[in-house]
Structures are given as structure tokens and as C-alpha cells.
Amino acid sequence: MSILFENCDLLLRGEDGVYSTLHGFLGVRGDTIDYIGTEKPTGEYEEHKSMEHKLLMPGLINCHNHSPMVLLRGVGSGLPLREWLFDKVFPIEDRLVPEDIAAGSRLAILEMLASGTTSFSDMYFFPAETVAAVAEAGMKANISRCVQCFDENQTVEQNTQIPQSVELFEKYHNAENGRIRIDFSIHAEYTCKPHIVRAYSELCKAYGGRMHIHLSETQREVDECIARYGKSPVAWFEELGTLDSPTAAAHCVAVSDEDIAILKRHGVNVIHNPTSNLKLGSGFAPVRKLMDAGINLALGTDGAASNNNLDMFEEMHLADIMPCGYRHDPTEVSSAEVLDMATVNGARLQGRSDTGVLAVGKKADIIALDLDKPHLYPNFDTPALLTCAAHSSDVVLTMVDGKILYENGEYKTLDREKVFYEARAAVKRLYA
């Protein structure tokens, strides 16, 4: 299949990280961008799409998600992290069955496609159901089976989650022509015992996998880890070998200068989750410090239970303005840096060097926004327009690997009514 997008604005990123806008044409052949220019190409395309007043940009990458948790949207609102998790979330999660994960994953995918997300990183339970949902929908995802252990007497052999994680990797890693990748995942320091973490981290390294963890989300987490082990969660994971694999660390709100040095030394990717951190009262991640240290900083929504949506445009908005407010400096973070977090930095975190920007030879993971809106005119700074003015409802097209998955309110690969029917049935059973 080949498509030529005509008369559109194209958001381009130079090698120097500077964004520019070009009015012209973008050609897609198969799963790849094969033309960008101001003149109409001479090659033949099977489909031509007039995109006047539309902006084409890279698809957004949500690097920290628990997609089936859309079924828990709003549960435990108003509680801090520990009480929210242990008193409200865990009891519901104990009742989850695979059918719930299937329903929740597809509902989350509807939300993500309509809001311009083309790829996401997910850690949760019954992950084969999420794999199936992503395969059907046509999205990209890095999916992991979250490993936990609350019993210090449990042996590595007794932990059933570890072999489930390994089986998932062996069965699905690089499935669907690489759209689906399998990561390894440890929930957090406070939900997993050291001997399990060490053994599982060694497995991840042996398989050449990527690791996805929660890390230093709150000061309480850090204080309790120091009381238990005499070191911060960052130092604890380093000692146990977790950071020896390419690691994506969500939150990193309460990190010291020493922690940041460890993260940098191991090339850890940090995922900024501003909405979730605000909603749970967790605090503010030291975004500028992390970036100045040379750490790759990506963006995520967290699960819908602590956000309460999967809207990456809202996430970009907060990531742009929040640090400027609490640091009393409007230059603390630039809109271009935030766009990087949501696109090319996310691609780097997921190990997808072939996406994240619009360029010839890159994968055609593209979204289109309708600029013919009062809140999007005039436009003197496209990155700022996207991070501080655009809404997810401005998205009119979402394409992954050259295939249109969502256009003008219509889903091309999922049956919206069926997804809602199954989601309602899951909610009814869970909360009966």
C-alpha cells in the first residue's frame, strides 16, 4: 500500500534537535516514509489524501502505562500512592481474570489511537491478552509481565511470575514484524524481595532484554528503602544488577544527585509522569537536573487509575509548564524538549531507532492534527502550539507502520461497539 499526503504542514526535526515546519508532501510506501518535499513527487501512489490545514507529526509514544487499568479509572481518588495502591487497587487486581485484561487493553487502545498515541510501554498482568489486543489493533507496544514478591521465604523457583515473563519473551518478542516487543519488569523495590530481583535481573541480562520498573516515586519510598537496606532504591537496584540491562525507570521523583549519577552511569532511561505524580501527591521530578546529566527523558501517562486518562497531549502540556512554575523560571524546560520526550526520546527508550521523527527511511508512525481550529491560530511556534494549545481531540488520523488505524472518529481495526460491550461486562463483574 502507498499513500501520498498532499498540501500539509510537516513537523520536521533536524539533527541538531531544532524543529521546523515544511508545507508540502509526504509519501508512504509500505511501512516506511519514502518522500518528503515541497514539490509533488513523480512516483505513483495508490492513494492520495488532501491534507489542507492539517499538520503531520510523529506519533506520540506513551512510555509508562498499565493499559488494562482503564477498568479502574478513578478508583481511590484523593489517596496518596501507598494507600491508593494497597487499600484500593491491589484488592481489585486480585479479582482480575484474562478476559478483563483483554477488555481493558482494547478500551485503552481506542483511547490512545484517538488521541495520537502510536506506541506504548506496558507493565501488567496476563500480558498475553494485551499482546493479542495490540496485534489486532495494529499499534506498537513494549509489553511486560510485572514481577512482584511480598514473601521473603518464597524461593525463586516458587515465584510463578518469573517463568511467565520468560515465556512471554520467548513467544512474542519481536512479533508482528517487530511491532510488539517484550520487556522484563519489576514492579518496585517495595513490592519485591532482593533475591527475586537479583535472579530476575540476571535472566533479563541473559536474554538481552529491556527492564521496566517503578523507581523512587515518592520520598516515603526512598526513606523506607534506606531504613530497610541502608541505601536508596536507585542504589539498591544497581547493587542487584537490575540496571545492567537497558532500563526504563518510571517517575524518579525523589532522586538525589548521587542517584542521578548512578542512572547516568548505567544509561537508564527515565519516564516523566507529571499528571500521575501530581494526582497522587508524589511531587515533582527534577526534570532539568536529569536532562542536564545527559539522561534520556521520555513521557508517560501512567495507568488511567492514577491520571485518569491516557492523553499524551495533556501530559505534554503539564511537562511543559509545570517545571517552569515550581522552579520560577519560564526557561526551565522548552516546548521542543517536551516534544522530544513524547516522540524521539520515547522511541529511543523502547529501542526503536526507526521511528520518532518524520524522515525518509523512518517507519510511517504518523498522526495528523486539524489546525483549522480557533485555539490553534495563529501559529508562531509549532512546538509550543502542540504542547500548550493543542488538544487530543484535534487528532484526525493515526497511522502505524503505514497503516491507518484511526481516521475522523472511525477505527479501522477494532470494533468500537464490541470493545465497549466487553469493557462494560468486565466492569460489571469486577465491581459486583
Locations of regions flagged by a protein language model:
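Divalent metal-coordination and catalytic microenvironments
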Residues: C8, L26, D31, H53, ...
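Active-site gating loops and adjacent loop-to-helix segments of metal-dependent hydrolytic enzymes
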Residues: L71-A103, L110, K140-I162, Q219-P246, ...
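Alpha-helical scaffold segments that flank or form the walls of functional sites
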Residues: R73-M139, I162-A175, A423-A432
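Metal-coordinating catalytic core of metallo-dependent amide/deamination hydrolases
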Residues: E129-V253, E258
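His/Asp/Glu-enriched, well-ordered alpha-helical/loop segment
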Residues: E239-P246, R288-K373, A389-H391
